[in-house]
Amino acid sequence: MNTVRVTFLLVFVLAVSLGQADKDENRMEVQEKTEQGKSYLDFAENLLLQKLEELEAKLLEEDSEESRNSRQKRCIGEGVPCDENDPRCCSGLVCLKPTLHGIWYKSYYCYKK
């Protein structure tokens, strides 16, 4: 009986020690793979970041060109007095002398075209 116990104990100790070695090996392999994966992910992340920055620069450039050309400065609305030499009427309005109901004011007003 003792020999069976000793044999069983010996096999158990060997299995545990070999299992620990395999566990350490597996842990090292997993660490190496994650480090390689991290370096690959860092590379992919940097590449994606560069592409996004390029796209953002292009979009901002287009927006700035659009806003520079199409932006309307402060304007005067319909029925508001304006200066005939420097009309600042909004788009779709023209600075004209009033016809009937504003003749006595002697100034120009913004009217629809």
From Swiss-Prot:
The keyword 4Fe-4S does not apply. It comes from the Eukaryota. Keywords: Disulfide bond, Ion channel impairing toxin, Knottin, Secreted, Signal, Toxin. Expressed by the venom gland. It is found in: Secreted. GO terms for cellular component: extracellular region. GO terms for molecular function: sodium channel inhibitor activity; toxin activity. Residues 22-74 form a propeptide. Residues 1-21 form the signal peptide. Pfam families: Toxin_22 (PF08092). Residues 61-83 are annotated as: Disordered. Probable ion channel inhibitor. The presence of a 'disulfide through disulfide knot' structurally defines this protein as a knottin. Belongs to the neurotoxin 14 (magi-1) family. 01 (HNTX-16) subfamily. This is U11-theraphotoxin-Hhn1a.
